[in-house]
């Protein structure tokens, strides 16, 4: 049983070493000379005009969530399209139900004005 998972374990260990080793080497071998210029916030070569922690409009997050939702829909459609001829009418109806639920949700978001930018 362990023989089946040994390549995966080796892959994870190599990935961990490749990811962590440069970080450790940079922090241990790199110069440590902090000064006020290096510790100040950087904004295109100029002094910061205002607080760097500006509040974002909630609509950005809403659009991002909607994008992820419909991107995930496409991720479900690809495997379905590959096995479409093997799953028959039951698979077709299940996917149509899934798409109908997403369309109803999209229409709801549209009617509520979540996609408007004014």
Swiss-Prot record:
<protein>
    <recommendedName>
        <fullName>NADH-quinone oxidoreductase subunit A</fullName>
        <ecNumber>7.1.1.-</ecNumber>
    </recommendedName>
</protein>
<comment type="similarity">
    <text>Belongs to the complex I subunit 3 family.</text>
</comment>
<dbReference type="InterPro" id="IPR038430">
    <property type="entry name" value="NDAH_ubi_oxred_su3_sf"/>
</dbReference>
<dbReference type="GO" id="GO:0050136">
    <property type="term" value="F:NADH:ubiquinone reductase (non-electrogenic) activity"/>
</dbReference>
<keyword id="KW-1133">Transmembrane helix</keyword>
<keyword id="KW-0997">Cell inner membrane</keyword>
<dbReference type="InterPro" id="IPR000440">
    <property type="entry name" value="NADH_UbQ/plastoQ_OxRdtase_su3"/>
</dbReference>
<keyword id="KW-0874">Quinone</keyword>
<feature type="transmembrane region" description="Helical">
    <location>
        <begin position="6"/>
        <end position="26"/>
    </location>
</feature>
<dbReference type="GO" id="GO:0008137">
    <property type="term" value="F:NADH dehydrogenase (ubiquinone) activity"/>
</dbReference>
<feature type="transmembrane region" description="Helical">
    <location>
        <begin position="64"/>
        <end position="84"/>
    </location>
</feature>
<dbReference type="Pfam" id="PF00507">
    <property type="entry name" value="Oxidored_q4"/>
</dbReference>
<dbReference type="InterPro" id="IPR023043">
    <property type="entry name" value="NAD(P)H_OxRDtase_bac/plastid"/>
</dbReference>
<keyword id="KW-0830">Ubiquinone</keyword>
<dbReference type="GO" id="GO:0005886">
    <property type="term" value="C:plasma membrane"/>
</dbReference>
<keyword id="KW-0813">Transport</keyword>
<feature type="transmembrane region" description="Helical">
    <location>
        <begin position="87"/>
        <end position="107"/>
    </location>
</feature>
<comment type="subunit">
    <text>NDH-1 is composed of 14 different subunits. Subunits NuoA, H, J, K, L, M, N constitute the membrane sector of the complex.</text>
</comment>
<keyword id="KW-0520">NAD</keyword>
<keyword id="KW-0472">Membrane</keyword>
<dbReference type="GO" id="GO:0048038">
    <property type="term" value="F:quinone binding"/>
</dbReference>
<keyword id="KW-0812">Transmembrane</keyword>
<dbReference type="GO" id="GO:0030964">
    <property type="term" value="C:NADH dehydrogenase complex"/>
</dbReference>
<comment type="function">
    <text>NDH-1 shuttles electrons from NADH, via FMN and iron-sulfur (Fe-S) centers, to quinones in the respiratory chain. The immediate electron acceptor for the enzyme in this species is believed to be ubiquinone. Couples the redox reaction to proton translocation (for every two electrons transferred, four hydrogen ions are translocated across the cytoplasmic membrane), and thus conserves the redox energy in a proton gradient.</text>
</comment>
<keyword id="KW-1278">Translocase</keyword>
<keyword id="KW-1003">Cell membrane</keyword>
């Amino acid at each position: 049983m362990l023989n089946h998972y040994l390549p995966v374990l080796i892959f994870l260990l190599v990935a961990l070493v490749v990811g962590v080793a440069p970080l450790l080497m940079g922090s241990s071998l790199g110069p440590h000379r902090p000064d006020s210029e290096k510790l100040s916030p950087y904004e295109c070569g100029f002094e910061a005009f205002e607080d760097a922690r500006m509040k974002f409009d909630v609509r950005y997050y809403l659009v991002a969530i909607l994008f992820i939702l419909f991107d995930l829909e496409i991720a479900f459609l690809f495997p379905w399209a590959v096995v479409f001829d093997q799953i028959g009418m039951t698979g077709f109806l299940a996917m149509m139900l899934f798409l109908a639920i997403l369309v109803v949700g999209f229409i709801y978001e549209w009617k509520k004005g979540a996609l408007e930018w004014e």
